[in-house]
């Protein structure tokens, strides 16, 4: 699904509210047929594993003190779905899925270009194979040639793993590339 609109019309706020990075002020949010607008903390943890986000600016969304490997492994560790020995294997698998060279595993975000940083952000978002991913302007900060690579990666992951995206953008050409449903928003 694509959400398109001018700057300031609330596209990113909608995405952040859906995944509980921001509190809602009105209305309800349903996920898997259940109102998740005001859920208890324990239930929110389970929901958060099923809903992730890929941010517009991969540099500011990645912990500068963590290596590529640590960033991608973090959700695996927090979830307690994997044993310690499995986390390393799963991290390597995810890095390969998103096209991050194994030699970059010990690199820090500032050592990577924008496209590689965004691949790390995507790797972190898909680590637990969530049902729903908000992609908040994930290619707007990238060069045009890199944009196509990242969009193709997102499409490939969507086809292979049945991921559902809410693609937030102001660029119709980007959303046409990735989305079959389109919602527009007008700031006025």
Model-found features: residue ranges?
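Helix-to-loop junction immediately C-terminal to a conserved catalytic motif
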Residues: 19
């Amino acid at each position: 699904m694509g959400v398109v609109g001018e700057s300031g019309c609330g596209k990113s706020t909608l995405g952040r509210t859906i995944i509980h990075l921001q509190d809602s002020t009105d209305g309800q949010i349903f996920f898997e047929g259940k109102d998740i607008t005001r859920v208890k903390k324990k239930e929110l943890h389970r929901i958060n594993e099923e809903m992730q986000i890929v941010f517009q600016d991969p540099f500011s969304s990645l912990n500068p003190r963590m290596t590529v490997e640590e960033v991608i492994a973090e959700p695996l560790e927090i979830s307690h779905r994997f044993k310690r020995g499995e986390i390393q294997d799963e991290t390597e698998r995810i890095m390969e899925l998103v096209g991050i060279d194994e030699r970059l595993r010990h690199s820090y975000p500032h050592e990577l270009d924008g496209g590689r940083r965004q691949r790390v952000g995507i790797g972190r978002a898909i680590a637990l194979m969530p049902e729903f991913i908000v992609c908040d302007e994930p290619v707007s900060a990238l060069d045009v040639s890199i944009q196509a690579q990242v969009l193709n990666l997102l499409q490939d992951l969507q086809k292979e793993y049945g991921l559902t995206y809410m693609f937030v953008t102001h660029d119709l050409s980007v959303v046409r590339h990735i989305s079959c449903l389109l919602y527009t928003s007008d700031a006025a």
